[in-house]
Amino acid sequence: MADKNSNEKLLYCSFCGKSQHEVQRLIAGPQVFICNECVELCNDIIREELEKGTGGEVIGGASADHPLPTPQEIRADLDQYIIGQDFAKKTLSVAVYNHYKRLYNKGGKDDVELAKSNILLIGPTGSGKTLLAQSLARLLDVPFVIADATTLTEAGYVGEDVEHIIQKLLQKCDYDVDKAQRGIVYIDEIDKISRKSENPSITRDVSGEGVQQALLKLIEGTVASVPPQGGRKHPNQEFIQVDTTNILFICGGAFDGLDKIIRQRSEKGGIGFGAEVSSKDDGKSLTKLFQEVEPQDIIRFGLIPELIGRLPVVATLEELDEEALVSILTQPKNALIKQYQKLFSLETVELEVRPSALRVIAKQALARKTGARGLRSILERALLDTMYELPSMQDVEKVVVDEKVIEKGDKPLFIYREGGGVAQSA
């Protein structure tokens, strides 16, 4: 090999001193050179600084140019999409802000380590639990995935094991591990995996308490082994390692029957003159009862104490009344009526839904006990024939929906462009 004293003019890295024959690539600058090994070393140094939060790391969609939104800003954004639920929105805003602030300050010089605060959402069906989680993920621009707790089983049994949740999260961000490790996971129907009784069962409960046990480490923070590109696990396979420590887990459920447990606890009184007297039927609504929930109530319902301990932030959602459902139909940024009006506008037709019709839709949703989730099915059924016939019709300018269309299934009012003609049917 030639050296510095030979006739051959060798080029050397200005940083490490290696010759062009000792490295794969030498990059030239103005009177200086750098080898590929030094470039890789520089990249490693910069990457380590970013992970410590000293170099403007992007966390949760925030950066030096786009700082993490404050709790009030998070709440204001949620207000655009979700009606009511003030307590839940405030609780979530603070919890999410603190979670991503914790990631910003990770690797600080002091010894204080900030623990993760996962969230438990308790509220009736159709009250907005899933929408809250989706809206948060959209605002923060982080990967988001919804997992159904009822499909989960213990590892080794038929069904999806808990690590499949992380696999879905990876798929959402094209297997970018760093991005996935800052994501949000919403586990729906968490109440459906409650154990069958308060006492430990002799028989194995693979889809109830077994799943709760499997979720413990995942929620608290562990390194999950995920098959690459969505494949199944098999021996001699390389796995993708995902650290769940910084993933925010939000669990939600309707918890049907929890109100009875809370009422039983609150009605228990002492004996004698000093006992607190309480009425057996104090007329408390589901909303007020849920606001009084204690960890012991959720444990009695069937979630294990260890899981409750890993979900320290509890946010309860209110029952939606008629006024709230009417507002949901019209006020949010992506309100249901606005969606259908947009759909009709693609046919150059204006859609008008009269206030009386909105009231009937809200009343029917209340009667079905489906909350906001039932609004779309009611409106879809009422407009099905119209949406079927409208693309084939000529010169329709406006479609008007009143209460009879919703209640009795009557045809909407059609207003035509030419001559201002009016037709009652298609």
UniProtKB/Swiss-Prot annotation:
Disulfide pairings: none
Binding locations of ATP: P124, T125, G126, S127, G128, K129, T130, L131
One GO term (biological process): proteolysis involved in protein catabolic process
ClpX-type ZB domain mapped to chain residues: 1-54
Xref: SMART domains: AAA, ClpB_D2-small, zf-C4_ClpX
Claim: GTP-binding is one of the keywords in the record: no
InterPro entries in the cross-refs: AAA+_ATPase, ATP-dep_Clp_protease_ClpX, ATPase_AAA_core, Clp_ATPase_C, Clp_protease_ATP-bd_su_ClpX, ClpX_bact, P-loop_NTPase, Znf_CppX_C4
Coiled-coil residue windows: none
Keywords on record: ATP-binding, Chaperone, Metal-binding, Nucleotide-binding, Zinc
Pfam family, one: zf-C4_ClpX
Binding sites annotated in the UniProt record for Zn(2+): C13, C16, C35, C38
Subunit-structure text: Component of the ClpX-ClpP complex. Forms a hexameric ring that, in the presence of ATP, binds to fourteen ClpP subunits assembled into a disk-like structure with a central cavity, resembling the structure of eukaryotic proteasomes.
Protein name: ATP-dependent Clp protease ATP-binding subunit ClpX
Organism: Chromobacterium violaceum (strain ATCC 12472 / DSM 30191 / JCM 1249 / CCUG 213 / NBRC 12614 / NCIMB 9131 / NCTC 9757 / MK)
Gene name linked to the record: clpX
